[in-house]
Amino acid sequence: MELNSEDVLVARYGELVLKGKNRSYFTKQLKINIKKAFKKLEINNSIVYEFDRIVVFDIKKEQRAILQELFSFLPGISLFFFASQIVREENKLLDLLFNLFKDFNSFKLEVKRRDKNFAENSSNFKKYLAVKLFEKYQLKGVINNPEIIANIEILKEHFLVFTERFKGKGGLPVYSSGKALVLLSGGIDSPVAASLVMQRGFNIDFITFINEPNKNQKTIEKITRLANLISFNKTICSGKLLVFDFTAIQKELIHISNESYRIVLMRRVFYKAASMFKYDCLVTGEVLGQVASQTIENLKVIQSATPDTFIVRPLIGFSKDKIIELAKFFNTFDISIEQHLDTCSEFSPKNPTTKAKLINVEKLESELIFLNDLIEKGVSELSND
């Protein structure tokens, strides 16, 4: 049976449609992002940008997997589907539906008129198709528990038919909100934080702090895989990973006179080093009260290390269950739970302070006369790479 149909991908914008006068700014950035991604992935299909959606034409079977993966990751896309597009002739639509339903015993139709000039309303046209399919092919339409559901969109010159929708990440296009540096560990929280800010339009890079890198190659490889996953192998954002050798600084911090402040001082070092790269903001996976260093008192003292730097903590009020749910949604969970050597846990004292005082921190830092030089040296080495 020759159906003369063309496979297309249709992707919807989601909240971009609601942006009013600023809408064109966001949709223009989304177009740029798609063009860059297609070029990197060597996809040459033609694209039409409509008011509330994108249509990619002439989808080949071998392209579906990579396009599905890309549009699942691409911020700014709320949902998408692959569809068969045929000329708007009822006999061709019936033939396509029969070909689609022939291996099933029951079906359901959903019809949407995007072309409001179409003579029949959606409900009547759906009934008409169901009767024709039963008369010609003895196919039975049902309301409850059908084996297959076909969605039909009526366009000006074509019908679109599809059976499955895929959820996108939603949000705003990358590069529409500035550039952020994410403090990325190998755990569950920071990859989720990175994914959330990317959804809000940030172009992101990553920095991770490793002690004795030669002994932590597996950890570095794990964090690299997370960075590549979040950035879709640098296809949808910059995705650069900076690996900061923390060994010399850690050897300094081990000698402070009050070991309960170790983690607080260590995180202040992280903030100071990361802020020297002059991004629009820093992003962390900190969650209020989740661990000893993340009490409100400690977070205030840690943040005071970089008073002129904007710190974004997307997870600050989330429960662990919610963060795990998001990690699974962003596909980072499986990598995050792989075992690795963690700088914080290796360095943590038996009784970490939960109520750090800035006066005590400043006194302890004054004991470490080489600390700032070591931070600047580490930043300089990465800046010159």
Curated annotation (Swiss-Prot):
Location in the cell: Cytoplasm
Gene Ontology BP term (one): thiamine biosynthetic process
Transmembrane segments: none
GO MF entries: ATP binding; CCA tRNA nucleotidyltransferase activity; tRNA binding; tRNA-uracil-4 sulfurtransferase activity
Keywords: ATP-binding, Cytoplasm, Nucleotide-binding, RNA-binding, Thiamine biosynthesis, Transferase, tRNA-binding
Substrates-to-products reaction catalysed: [ThiI sulfur-carrier protein]-S-sulfanyl-L-cysteine + a uridine in tRNA + 2 reduced [2Fe-2S]-[ferredoxin] + ATP + H(+) = [ThiI sulfur-carrier protein]-L-cysteine + a 4-thiouridine in tRNA + 2 oxidized [2Fe-2S]-[ferredoxin] + AMP + diphosphate; [ThiS sulfur-carrier protein]-C-terminal Gly-Gly-AMP + S-sulfanyl-L-cysteinyl-[cysteine desulfurase] + AH2 = [ThiS sulfur-carrier protein]-C-terminal-Gly-aminoethanethioate + L-cysteinyl-[cysteine desulfurase] + A + AMP + 2 H(+)
Residues noted as binding ATP in the record, renumbered to the chain: L183, L184, T208, F209, R267, G285, Q294
Signal peptide: none
Pfam families: ThiI (PF02568), ThiI_fer (PF22025), THUMP (PF02926)
Annotated pathway: Cofactor biosynthesis; thiamine diphosphate biosynthesis
Gene Ontology cellular component list: cytosol
Enzyme class: transferase
Domain THUMP: 65-165
General function of this protein: Catalyzes the ATP-dependent transfer of a sulfur to tRNA to produce 4-thiouridine in position 8 of tRNAs, which functions as a near-UV photosensor. Also catalyzes the transfer of sulfur to the sulfur carrier protein ThiS, forming ThiS-thiocarboxylate. This is a step in the synthesis of thiazole, in the thiamine biosynthesis pathway. The sulfur is donated as persulfide by IscS.
Family statement: Belongs to the ThiI family.
HAMAP family (alphabetical): ThiI
Protein name per its UniProtKB record: Probable tRNA sulfurtransferase
Species whose genome carries this gene: Mycoplasma genitalium (strain ATCC 33530 / DSM 19775 / NCTC 10195 / G37) (Mycoplasmoides genitalium)
